[in-house]
Every structure is written in structure tokens, then in C-alpha cells.
From Swiss-Prot:
The keyword Cytoplasm applies. Substrate binds at E60, R106, E116. It is found in: Cytoplasm. It comes from Aspergillus oryzae (strain ATCC 42149 / RIB 40). InterPro entries: 3hydroanth_dOase (IPR010329), RmlC-like_jellyroll (IPR014710), RmlC_Cupin_sf (IPR011051). O2 binds at R50. It holds the Pfam family 3-HAO. One of its GO terms (biological process) is anthranilate metabolic process. A divalent metal cation binds at C131, C134, C168, C171. Belongs to the 3-HAO family. Pathway: Cofactor biosynthesis; NAD(+) biosynthesis; quinolinate from L-kynurenine: step 3/3. This is 3-hydroxyanthranilate 3,4-dioxygenase 1.
Length: 192
């Protein structure tokens, strides 16, 4: 028998405490469940202020349920790479192409849904940090993703605990693990 549809407002009422930093997500449909056919569906809350960029070998689908978010992306096909911020407003959706470095910035009292396709066997995810001063890659970690919620947290904490990993080899700037208060401006709640 199939499970019932997930009612987002009721789920949030009972489970919003599960959306904890540094990742702030909860897998409502886990890829290990036979019913999901390998798909991952997460409810993600704000605020989060992580500075890492995730690179996934499959597209990612974003739906912004409450409030607005900022999806920071990097076009690595350009030389030099081009940094682009994409606002995703309440009620809007966005499909991020595979292999696009992205940093989802979520603000206070915002909630979104993210869906990821099944990854190929042995596919490698990457968490990467870029230098704010010169744009070079500061550090990255590659891993086979088996549990996004726990693995991302571990890599973020590993980076944060090691100043050598956080120091840009090109210019010496030490990368922050979080954006500073007021550094990023939340887009308007609705698209005007």
C-alpha cells in the first residue's frame, strides 16, 4: 500500500524542530526506501548561513514553500568561473542543472522542498569552498553520498575546525564557514 501524501503545514507543525543547523534539512523521503526509487526529498528550513558549494551529478529541484531564498551558483564552464545569485521566491520553483556548484542560502522563517534524483552507483558529490577575495577554490571534499543529512554536516564541521583547510593557497585569505550578519540580502518574499 502506498503512503499518504505529505501535508507540509502539518508536517512542519509537528517536526520543525528537526530542521537544525548546519544543514537544516530533514529527508521526508529517503533514497534507501524502496518506495522512493532512489529519490531524495528534503524539507529545508532557515536560517542557514553555510558558505560551501555543493556539486551533485544529478539535477536538483527546488520549490520554495515559505519566504524567499538565495541560490548562489558558479558557472564553471566560463573562464574565469562566473558567480551568479538566483533568488527563489515563495511559491517559485527552480531546476538546477547537474554538476552546478551551488550554495543554498536560507533566511529566518523560510521553508523549501528540495528533490534530488538517484545518483549513479559510486557517483561522487563534492563540497567546495571558494575564496571571497580572489574566487579560487580554497578546499573541497569528495565523497560518495549515502546519507546527505549526516555527511554534509561532517564535512562542514571538518572544514570549520581546520584553519589550514580554510586558508586560500592563492591569496592567503581565511575562508569563513558562515556568512556574516547582513552580508547577504534576502530577496523579496514574492516575485514582483
Amino acid at each position: 500500500m502506498l503512503p499518504p501524501a505529505l501535508n507540509i503545514p502539518k508536517w512542519l507543525e509537528a517536526n520543525s524542530h528537526l530542521l537544525q543547523p548546519p544543514v537544516n534539512n530533514y529527508c521526508v523521503y529517503h533514497p534507501s526506501s524502496p518506495a522512493t526509487a532512489g529519490y531524495t526529498v528534503m524539507i529545508v528550513g532557515g536560517p542557514n548561513a553555510r558558505t560551501d558549494y555543493h556539486i551533485n551529478t544529478t539535477p536538483e529541484f527546488f520549490y520554495q514553500y515559505r519566504g524567499s531564498m538565495l541560490l548562489r551558483t558558479v558557472d564553471t564552464s566560463a573562464s574565469p568561473p562566473v558567480f551568479q545569485d538566483i533568488p527563489i521566491h515563495e511559491g517559485s520553483l527552480f531546476l538546477l542543472p547537474a554538476n552546478t556548484p551551488h550554495c543554498p542560502v536560507r533566511f529566518k522563517d523560510t521553508v523549501g522542498v528540495v528533490m534530488e534524483q538517484p545518483r549513479a552507483e559510486g557517483a561522487v558529490d563534492i563540497l567546495r569552498w571558494y575564496c571571497k577575495s580572489c574566487g579560487e577554490i580554497v578546499w573541497e571534499k569528495r565523497f560518495v553520498c549515502t546519507d546527505l543529512g549526516t555527511q554534509v554536516k561532517e564535512v562542514v564541521e571538518e572544514f570549520g575546525a581546520d584553519q589550514e583547510k580554510r586558508t586560500c593557497k592563492a591569496c592567503g585569505t581565511v575562508a569563513e564557514t558562515k556568512y556574516k550578519e547582513g552580508e547577504l540580502v534576502q530577496p523579496p518574499r514574492f516575485l514582483e
